[in-house]
Amino acid sequence: MNDLCADIGYKSINHVGEQLCGDHVDIVEQGDGSTVIVLADGLGSGVKASILSTLTSKIISTMLAAGLPIEECVSAIAATLPVCSVRGVAYSTFTIIHLRNNETAELIQYDNPQVILIRDEKNFEYPRTEMNIGGKKIFKSVIKLQEDDLFIAMSDGCPHAGIGMSYNFGWKREDIAAFMETICVAGYTAKTLSTILIDEVNKLYGGKPGDDATACIVRIRKRVPMNLLFGPPSNRDDCDRMMSLFFSKEGKHIICGGTTSSIAAKYLGKPLKATLSFERSDIPPIAEIEGVDLVTEGVITINRVVEYAKDYIEANTEYAEWSMKRDGASLIARLLFEEATDITFFVGRAVNPAHQNPDLPINFNIKMNLVKELSECLRKMGKHIKVSYFYGVRNHEKIRYQGAVPQVQGASRGRARRVEPHAA
């Protein structure tokens, strides 16, 4: 079984003075375990470029995902794109990375900077075949994937950075490759790598980008399962069953909540060791149970993780905060955002009497909403999510399972796609 998966992340900066980005990235997951990633760069900048790039990426990704050949995609783009009233042309460059079951990558490139492949921590020169489709020179490559392969797709705003300032002729492709070689060894996620690259591009522009710039990074890695337990079941008789299912799962185990951790400690026959050292005044301290990878408080900690997750899939400005700190929320964020690819939530639906105080901004619905929000954010990152809710039912014991959270529509900012379904 292929246990590789693709961690996909991207970031863009706009041309100075523009509200919209003229680059667009679209990602479509296919039912056969394949993924189509399209980075399009519209002619010029601003609204017109945004329309051109969005149409291009949407048309190509949708048609390729449906199994249509690239020739038909290019013809459809030529017939669909609106013509620029100033230049008299309809034009958008594009880069396509088509991952087939995470075994091979098909690269199709038209007028964007050539995709960089970092393999074994070095810039790897791969073969390219030239095609002529509708008068357009298009390059195609087919590459067999290896673990730790790193694909770097860019719009031309990246190599143009620093022209006339730091560099006479811009930040050349080989210089960008050398820069990425030095940081890829740190094991950063694709989202973090794209953020580092675009931040460097922005510096070379002196904080005033002369063009839209986008970096989309695909990192090939092994699948990593992880399990998070949040709250006890509403039926006390289901505690042992819930714990048995939770601890039988492959991967690391995270427990959130005071009552939940006490039940887990009793089930394991191990002491619950609370720590009184506050890493942060606004996040409760963590605890320890032998056999459990991380034990934290519940609602307050998870609420902060949700805040981090929302920022991570957008601007990723809070990375420096949670990537280094040792509080419960930061530790959970690192495990879920950076390490895990397949995450199973075990959610108990017991009502905590302490949360029924009308003076507290915490109630049962907030707890359930936190699970929903976090699950949706993680899916936007490309994680494979399964949520199991534990209900108590009169006259008989029953555990009700809710399957994977529905796919959230819209392009994501950071994704890590699984290869095979994660068994319940």
Which residues does each predicted region cover?
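Primarily the active-site beta-strand->alpha-helix module of PP2C/PPM metal-dependent phosphatases
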Residues: H24-A78, I152, G164-A177
